[in-house]
C-alpha cells in the first residue's frame, strides 16, 4: 500500500515538473545568446564558475533545444580555459556546457598577445574555435540577432 502511494506520488511529481519545463519553454521560445567573458576568474576561479552556472541556469530555464549559445572569450577571460586545464570543477562545467552545444569562441588576438598555444595551454580548444577578434565577434553576433549577456 505504501509502495503504491509512493509510486503515485513520484509519478505525479514527474508530471508536474514536466509541466513547469514545458511552461518555461513556451514562455521563453527560441533564443540566440552570446555570453562575454573578458575578466579574470578571481580566487579559486569563482567568477568563472559563476559564469558557467549562469549559462547552465539559462539552459535549464529555456531548454538546450531552444538555445544557441556562444561564449566569446578574450583578454583576461582566456583564463577560463587556462584554468580549466587544472581546475577539475571548471573543466567539468565547460565539458558539460559543450555537451549541450554551447560553443566557446576564443580570440586570436588574445592568443597572440599572451603568447598562448591553444592546443597546449587551453582546455578543449580546437582551430575552429578560434575567431580573429573577440570584440569584432561580439559585434558580428549581435548583428545576427544574438542577445548580449555579460555574466
Regions found by a protein language model. Name each.
Residues 1-9:
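Bacterial N-terminal signal peptides that target proteins for export
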Residues 8-16:
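Bacterial N-terminal signal peptides
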Residues 16-26:
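Bacterial Sec-dependent signal peptides at the C-terminal "C-region" and cleavage site
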Residues 26-42, 72-76:
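Acidic/histidine-rich, surface-exposed loop or edge segments in extracytoplasmic proteins
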Residues 37-51, 81:
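Short, glycine-rich nucleotide/cofactor-binding loops
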Residues 47-63:
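Histidine-anchored nucleotide/phosphate-binding helix
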Residues 68-81, 110-111:
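Acidic helix-start/capping segments at beta-turn-to-alpha-helix junctions
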Residues 83-151:
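A cross-taxonomic marker for long C-terminal extensions/tails that follow the last structured domain
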Amino acid at each position: 500500500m505504501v509502495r503504491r502511494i509512493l509510486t503515485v506520488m513520484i509519478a505525479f511529481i514527474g508530471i508536474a515538473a514536466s509541466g513547469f519545463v514545458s511552461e518555461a519553454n513556451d514562455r521563453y521560445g527560441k533564443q540566440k545568446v552570446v555570453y562575454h567573458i573578458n575578466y579574470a576568474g578571481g580566487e579559486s576561479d569563482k567568477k568563472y564558475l559563476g559564469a558557467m552556472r549562469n549559462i547552465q541556469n539559462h539552459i535549464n530555464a529555456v531548454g538546450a533545444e531552444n538555445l544557441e549559445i556562444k561564449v566569446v572569450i578574450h583578454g583576461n577571460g582566456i583564463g577560463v580555459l587556462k584554468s580549466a586545464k587544472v581546475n577539475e570543477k571548471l573543466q567539468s562545467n565547460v565539458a558539460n556546457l559543450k555537451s549541450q552545444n554551447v560553443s566557446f569562441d576564443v580570440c586570436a588576438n588574445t592568443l597572440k598577445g599572451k603568447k598562448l598555444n591553444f592546443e597546449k595551454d587551453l582546455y578543449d580548444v580546437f582551430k575552429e574555435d578560434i575567431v580573429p577578434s573577440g570584440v569584432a565577434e561580439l559585434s558580428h553576433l549581435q548583428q545576427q540577432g544574438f542577445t548580449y549577456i555579460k555574466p
